[in-house]
Each structure stands twice: as structure tokens, then as C-alpha cells.
Design a protein with these regions (language model features):
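Active-site metal-binding motif and surrounding structural segment of the metallo-beta-lactamase
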Residues: 107-154
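Active-site neighborhood of phospho(di)ester-bond hydrolases with catalytic His/Asp-centered motifs
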Residues: 100-104, 124-133, 153-156, 217-221, ...
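Cap/insert and terminal regions of metallo-dependent hydrolase folds
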Residues: 3, 227-339
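Metal-dependent catalytic neighborhoods of phosphoester/phosphodiester hydrolases
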Residues: 138-148, 164-166, 300-307
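Metallo-beta-lactamase
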Residues: 50, 56-62, 156-206, 210-213
Length: 354
């Protein structure tokens, strides 16, 4: 049954909708006298409402404010579990989320180290792969099978290379999150962007990573520093860069000539002097931590790599260089430098902007 609204009754002599009328004939509500007690109560309520609004905007307590700024994350967490041809894996995280770069180190060792440093695997959201060589992917499927909440982030070409090169179940595709170079994606609280690096793997990638004001760059396994790699590495506050070999040691070593040529090619690995000269050229006070990674077991030593980089930085005017320790003296240095161990964990390293 249709419902109808009753038409209002129009009284004779009252103005119509479009008629002009003298509003001075009507008395406003503001013109009526107000009892002093009512007026006082209204003033009290207005004052209380004003105080409540100010408390919402400026109070540091638990009161919610729609204009309250998000908390600033002033430090990040970093652990390297191993870096070199025997296996590569590293962790970046904040207080609530994190991820792994590569999965070439035994899963049990990685998980034990994370737990020892108070990091729950539930907060480790995924694995970002740099390329498909075995020292970077050997344990990736083991992680995914045990921790079903995790995903593997790599380009489709890198995933195809991984399946082609290694005896890994096709079910890894169920955990694959496809990424594309120069297109940002997120893992937890981090934004990552993969960029092209020169190496002889399949669709090799470096990573430019941000979390608030923190800028991280990972550039491992690259034979030369391309324009895109240079573009992103200059943005870094924390830089993981390869220093694979000492050129005289490689030349005098026992490797066959074809392998020496492969290592020293533009699609191979970086030697200490190239890395050192490059770091001296791009250094600014914004660069807080330098991690030398993927040192060769046969053609390099940590001391040789560190000395090459330290000498280049000092020639560029950097007089104080810390060692990534928590000692007050080391923390006062404008830049921290460390050669990542080949087989061991670094322990938890705190990354600070100040």
C-alpha cells in the first residue's frame, strides 16, 4: 500500500514560499531573556568541551588524536648469517616486522640466531632473492615449507631460473610474490625496489629499501657498477656492497684461467680496489654503515678488503671510521665499516641515523 505524506495546512494571511515578508515582525530566540543559572551552565559546558578538544590535540597520554603524528622509527635491526660462496643470508627488521635477503644459509642456524636475538619468526614476512645461484637460494623452499606465512619475492624470470637450475618443488610457485624491477613493493613495514645489477645469474637484482627515513641498499654479486646501481647506492644510509677479491691474489691463485676471467668480468664480481674507489667517490655524511659482503675465501681476506676501503675513505677526508661495535668510541665515528663474516653470524647490529 502506498504511503502519502499529508500536505501542510496553509493558514490564510501567512506568507507563501516565495513571498517577501518583514522578518522584523518575528522574535528571535536570542532575544528572549536567559536565566542566569542556565547561562552559567552553558558557559561551563563550552569551557569543558574546549578543554577536551585541546587535550585530544596536544596531550602525550593515551587520548587518541586524529592529528597525532605516527611514531618515528629511529633504529633498525640487521643480522648477517653468512656471506660468501658458501652461503648468503641477511635479516633487516624493525620492532614489528622484517624479512630475509636471500636464503643460502642453513635454516636451523638462521632461526636459532633470530631467536637468540629476540626475533620471532612470525614477524619475518618473507625472503627477497637477489638471483638464482645456489649460495643464495639453497634453503629457500625449506623456509617456505616450515613457515607458511612467508612469501618469496623475486622476478618471474628469477623464479624460472631457480626451478631450472635446482631440484626445488614446483610448489614454490604457491609462495611466490612476483616483483618487477623499478616497481616498489612492500614487506611488512618496509618498501623495497629491485634494480638491475650486472652478474651472470638469471635476472639479477639489487635492492633499494626504505623504512621511514632509513634508506638501505643491497648490492651483492655484481661485476661492475652500472648506472642504475650507482643511482640507488648514492641514496643509502646503510650500504651492503660486494668486495669479492683482491686482484693480485686472484691473478696468482690456482683458479683456472676461464674462472679467473669469469670472476673479473663485468658480469662477475667486484674487486676490493673498485669498491674502495667507488665508496670514496660517493661518500657523504648520510652514509652511516658500510658492509663489505661476499668476500672470496681463496682470493681475499677481511683485513685486505677493510684496509683497501679504509685507505680510500681516509684519502677522501674521512678521518674516523667505526667498526659497527656498540662501544661509545665506535659510535662517535661518522661512518661504520665491517666485512661480513663468510660462515658466521654478525650478531644483532643496530642501524641508527644519528
Amino acid at each position: 500500500m502506498a504511503r502519502y505524506k499529508k500536505r501542510p495546512t496553509i493558514q490564510p494571511g501567512m506568507p507563501g514560499l516565495f513571498d517577501d515578508f518583514d522578518d522584523s515582525l518575528f522574535t528571535s530566540a536570542d532575544d528572549f531573556p536567559v536565566h542566569p543559572a542556565i547561562e552559567k551552565e552553558a558557559e561551563r559546558r563550552l569551557a569543558a568541551e574546549k578543554e577536551k578538544r585541546e587535550r585530544m590535540l596536544f596531550d602525550d597520554g593515551d587520548t587518541f588524536s586524529p592529528l597525532e603524528a605516527l611514531p618515528t622509527i629511529d633504529r633498525l635491526k640487521f643480522i648477517s648469517f653468512g656471506s660468501g660462496s658458501s652461503g648468503n643470508c641477511a635479516y633487516f627488521g624493525d620492532d614489528t616486522s622484517g624479512f630475509l635477503i636471500d636464503a643460502g644459509v642453513d635454516m636451523v642456524h638462521v632461526v636459532d640466531e633470530l631467536h637468540r636475538n629476540g626475533i620471532d619468526m612470525k614477524t619475518v614476512k618473507g625472503i627477497a632473492l637477489t638471483h638464482d645461484h645456489s649460495d643464495h637460494v639453497r634453503y629457500v623452499y625449506a623456509f617456505l615449507r616450515k613457515y607458511r606465512h612467508m612469501q618469496v619475492f623475486c622476478t618471474p624470470r628469477a623464479l624460472n631460473g631457480l626451478l631450472r637450475r635446482h631440484a626445488i618443488s614446483n610448489r614454490i610457485k604457491d609462495y611466490h610474490h612476483a616483483i618487477y624491477k623499478e616497481h616498489p613493493f612492500t614487506i611488512g613495514n618496509f618498501t623495497l625496489l629491485a634494480f638491475e645489477v650486472m652478474h651472470d645469474g638469471t635476472d639479477n637484482a639489487g635492492y633499494y629499501i626504505t623504512n621511514g627515513a632509513h634508506h638501505i641498499v643491497v648490492a651483492t654479486d655484481l661485476g661492475c657498477i652500472s648506472e642504475r646501481a650507482d643511482f640507488y647506492m648514492r641514496k643509502a644510509n646503510y650500504l651492503m656492497i660486494e668486495a669479492n677479491y683482491n686482484a693480485p691474489m686472484l691473478a696468482a691463485g690456482t683458479y683456472p684461467e676461464y674462472l679467473k676471467a669469469r670472476i673479473s668480468s663485468d658480469n662477475g664480481h667486484l674487486d676490493n680496489e673498485v669498491t674502495a674507489e667507488y665508496l670514496a667517490r660517493i661518500y657523504t655524511p648520510a652514509l652511516r654503515n658500510i658492509f663489505l659482503c661476499h668476500l672470496s675465501k681463496d682470493n681475499n681476506t677481511p683485513d685486505i678488503a677493510l684496509n683497501a676501503v679504509e685507505d680510500a675513505l681516509r684519502q677522501a677526508g674521512v678521518t674516523e671510521i667505526g667498526d659497527c661495535s656498540e662501544s661509545p668510541y665506535a659510535r662517535m665515528a661518522p661512518v661504520q665499516l665491517m666485512a661480513l663474516p663468510r660462515f658466521d653470524s654478525t650478531g644483532l647490529i643496530t642501524l641508527r641515523l644519528k
